[in-house]
Structures are given as structure tokens and as C-alpha cells.
Amino acid sequence: MHCPFCGTQDTKVIDSRLVADGASVRRRRECNHCKERFTTFETAELVMPRVIKTDGSREPFNEDKLRNGLLRALEKRPVSLELMEQAINKIKSSIRATGEREISSNFVGSLVMENLKQIDKVAYVRFASVYRSFEDIREFGEEIARLND
């Protein structure tokens, strides 16, 4: 790997450890030429399937859309960003585990709901109200009743 300080290719790894629940490797490196030290992070680059939207159009999986949807549902709720990131990683792992090249947006939505139900029931109902297009208060009540079952 090139040294970011002097540009030499001659660097060595002096320490490696797993981070982010084993999803990444943090490496401390040292340049053999200028002796500067720096940190790199290594993660597997995995291709996510395309998402088939309800109107039939297709688009690449967008992690930012997933994160924003979770942030909206979890807004002002006592849930840490770390817990939310874990949910994002679980959802992405479930999507990858299908082995499919394309998945439906409904499948993604159901994974989000499944994870929100485990994290925060209020956020789950918030997300469900948008995802399922609740029309009136009765539908909220029915969803809350299903939570208690």
C-alpha cells in the first residue's frame, strides 16, 4: 500500500484487529521509508441486488434511503445510532443472503419492519403507518393490537 505521507509503496502492517462486529479490519501500518504510521480500514465490497419498486421500475439498492427511513422512524426515540447501524447491517446481510440479483421493495420494507419491531415499538408503528399507508386511526389501533399478540 502507498504511504499517504511520502508515496512510497513499501509499508508494513504492525497491528490488525476486527472492528464493527467483524465486518471490517482495522490495520495500523508503518512506512518503511519515512517511518510515519497510519490507519487503514478494510471491508469486503459486496454487490447489493437491485430493488424492484411497486411501480415496476428498478433501481440500485440505496443504503442512504434505508438509513433515512430508519432515522425518520426513530426520530426522538431513545435508540442509539450504533443500534440503528446494527439494524442496517442486519437488513443488508438478509438481503445479500437471498442470493438474488433483484429484490422487491416490499421485501426490504418487511425486513425494516421486522428489525424495528425488535428495536422500538413506537418507531415500528411510525414506519408501518407510512409503509402500509394507514388511512385512519383505526388502522393504527389494529397495528398496535397486533404488536400485543
From Swiss-Prot:
One GO MF term: DNA binding
Cofactor binding mode and count: Binds 1 zinc ion.
Highest taxon above the source species: Bacteria
Swiss-Prot/TrEMBL cofactor(s): Zn(2+)
UniProt KW Transmembrane helix keyword: no
GO biological process per UniProt: negative regulation of DNA-templated transcription
Keywords recorded for this protein, A-Z: ATP-binding, DNA-binding, Metal-binding, Nucleotide-binding, Repressor, Transcription, Transcription regulation, Zinc, Zinc-finger
All residue ranges annotated as the ATP-cone domain in the record: 49-139
Pfam families noted in UniProt: ATP-cone, Zn_ribbon_NrdR
Renumbered zinc finger spans (unnamed): 3-34
Family annotation (NCBIfam families): transcriptional regulator NrdR (TIGR00244)
Function: Negatively regulates transcription of bacterial ribonucleotide reductase nrd genes and operons by binding to NrdR-boxes.
Record-stated family: Belongs to the NrdR family.
UniProt protein name: Transcriptional repressor NrdR
Gene name for this UniProt entry: nrdR
